[in-house]
A protein has these predicted regions:
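Alpha-helical transmembrane segments and their helix-entry boundary regions
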Residues: 5-6, 14, 82, 105-106
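Short, conserved beta-strand/beta-arch hydrophobic-aromatic motifs that form part
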Residues: 90
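Aromatic-anchored segments of alpha-helical transmembrane domains
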Residues: 27, 111-125, 174-187
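Active-site alpha-helix of zinc metalloproteases
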Residues: 5, 81-82, 237, 281
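Membrane-interface helix-loop-helix regions
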Residues: 14-87, 115-124, 128-129, 200-214
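Alpha-helical transmembrane spans of integral membrane proteins, capturing the lipid-embedded, hydrophobic core
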Residues: 10, 14-23, 203-204, 266, ...
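Alpha-helical transmembrane segments in multi-pass integral membrane proteins
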Residues: 1-5, 61-70, 96-100, 131-276, ...
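Hydrophobic transmembrane alpha-helices of multi-pass, membrane-embedded glycosylation machinery
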Residues: 24-27, 112-115, 155-156, 247-248
Length: 298
């Protein structure tokens, strides 16, 4: 496969839903006006539309177009920042990293792992949160969050031979539960401890979870359909859900509602996100990608 073909395939796979995510973000934008983002109602429509069209390209907007006020690369669709870095990873892979030997790739993964640990243990918040703004600090966070998972995944694919592990789904699920059950460790006086926990979870536990999941067997047709559904919807829900999170978060901030009273609205937000994502997948993403494959990848 040529470099040009590789880039075409990545664009066909990712870009249609990038556009849809920005459109949904634009439609929902003015409904997000709240005490968290008190200037939204002052944003002229032409500026919001301009931000939307720039977002179609995933090019980060400059600070002058930060229409939300959160210093986001993509104010209409927050998660777009990570896709921006994914494209950087794809470019690095196509131009350089794909030619690396296993030894060279291992060195790159080791260094990027060290960079991730350094980021986490020296962070003023003791974690790896960030990466969505266009300044030196946030770019450092974004690149550190990109490099190890992206190239570590490539190394894992190259060197690991999958076997069949009994109850792989059970073990991987238990690991996920353990990690999520301990979102933070240590005290506010020792933030480095949580930074070390976060970074080692990313470096050791998450690759292990991926390996276990890939080593399992699916024998039930029902389970197979569920897995396919979750796999198909994962990207659409990722790139479209945040518009509804903005609305929900702003509403909670305005009403100061108790957590116990907010559960129905939380569930409604979750269900809405899933339904919209699935509709986008079936009515837009799959047909558009099929058409693009015939036109561009033939």
């Amino acid at each position: 496969m040529s470099i040009a073909d590789f880039f075409k395939r990545r664009l066909v796979r990712l870009q249609p839903m990038v556009i849809m995510g920005m459109i949904i973000g634009a439609i929902c934008f003015y409904f997000q006006d709240s005490i968290l983002w008190p200037t939204i109602h002052e944003v002229p429509i032409w500026k919001m539309i301009l931000v939307m069209f720039i977002g179609f390209t995933l090019i980060p907007v400059p600070p002058t177009l930060d229409i939300r006020g959160w210093a986001e690369m993509h104010p209409l669709d927050g998660p777009g920042w990570s896709l921006f870095y994914e494209y950087i990873g794809n470019i690095l892979y196509a131009l350089f990293v794909r030619k690396f030997s296993k030894t060279a790739l291992s060195i790159l993964v080791f260094l990027s792992g060290c960079a991730l640990i350094h980021l986490a243990v020296t962070s003023p918040t003791g974690d790896v949160i960030g990466g969505w703004a266009l300044d030196s600090t946030q770019i450092h966070i974004g690149l550190s969050r990109l490099l190890f998972p992206f190239f570590g995944g490539i190394l894992l694919h190259r060197v690991v031979n999958l076997t069949t592990i009994k109850n792989a789904f059970l073990w991987s699920s238990l690991l996920i539960i353990v990690v999520l059950a301990m979102p933070r460790v240590g005290s506010s006086e020792n933030l480095w401890q949580n930074g070390l926990y976060d970074s080692l979870s990313i470096i050791i536990l998450f690759p292990l979870i991926v390996y276990l999941g890939a080593s399992g067997e699916i024998k039930s047709k029902t389970v197979s359909r569920i897995c396919k559904f979750l796999g198909d919807i994962s990207y659409p829900i990722y790139i479209t859900h945040y518009a509804f999170i903005y609305i929900y978060t702003g509403w909670v901030a305005d009403t100061k509602i108790k957590i116990s009273d907010a559960y129905p609205y939380s569930i409604l937000t979750l269900v809405t996100s899933i339904v919209i994502a699935y509709a986008c997948l079936k009515l837009y993403d799959e047909p558009v990608r099929s058409w693009l494959k015939k036109k561009i990848l033939k």
